[in-house]
Amino acid sequence: RNKGRMVRISNYSRDCLPDLIAETGIEYVGREQGTLQLFRTEKQLKGSKADQEILAEYDSPFELLDRAGCIAVEPALAAVPSKFVGGLRLTADRTGDCRMFTVALAEKAAELGVQFQYGQSIRGIAVENGKVAGVETEMAGRITGDVYVCALGSFAPMVLRPIGIRLPVYPVKGYSVTLPVTDDAMAPQSTIMDETHKVAITRLGDRIRVAGTAEIAGYSGRLGPHATDTVRYVIEDLFP
């Protein structure tokens, strides 16, 4: 059920992106070479049937690949054929540097008159007659608007709880490393998701971003001594 919802919203985002790029001309080292979910075992390959049914239900294009098919779309995997048995490729997926994209998008929005007030601390949300009347900030006082959107991730529950809104949101910590491409022929071309270790490897121009792990550790931003061991293992295992 939740996966179906995620597929629908990701498809909507994917379909809106080309128009936004065409209109703004934003550069974000984007690629249109899909995402390859890599299976290391036959059990994982067979178990992907449920995912395939959801993708088909919501018209999300995909193809099921054997080992040779995976190597055809990601040639560097030819160096480690024993590490995987096949994959599920989401052919319409795009990749790119999300930070580069959002910074450029904010600049475009500012050119159109959008005001960004960075560094503000929220003291609370003002409610009048059962409706949000403004956001109380430390430096700018009350900020008002026609519509209010709370997009604070795992911090949203703290802000909304005082006005009676409870969100089932909790922080989950992930880890990533960014590495330079030293040999194009031995590097990934798009995004590869290691199904076993839940680690994503993404090509960002002349860099590779490797991200994964889901650690329930509260709001601590501390990095343990072995925090990136898994993501480093995966990139070295698949792209030695």
Report each predicted region and the residues it spans:
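Dinucleotide-binding Rossmann-like beta1-alpha1 core, especially the glycine-rich loop
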Residues: 1-67
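Conserved beta-strand segments of alpha/beta enzyme cores
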Residues: 61-63, 115, 166
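Short beta-strand to alpha-helix junction loop
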Residues: 3-14, 37-47, 72, 88-107, ...
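Helical element adjacent to the flavin cofactor pocket in flavoenzyme catalytic cores
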Residues: 46-58, 78-146
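Alpha-helix N-cap/helix-start capping motif
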Residues: 42, 67-68, 99, 120, ...
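Active-site substrate-recognition segment that forms the wall
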Residues: 1, 78, 122-132, 142-240
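Alpha-helical scaffold segments in soluble metabolic enzymes
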Residues: 16-19, 50, 104, 108-111, ...
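General beta-strand structural signal in soluble alpha/beta enzymes
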Residues: 63-66, 117-118, 150
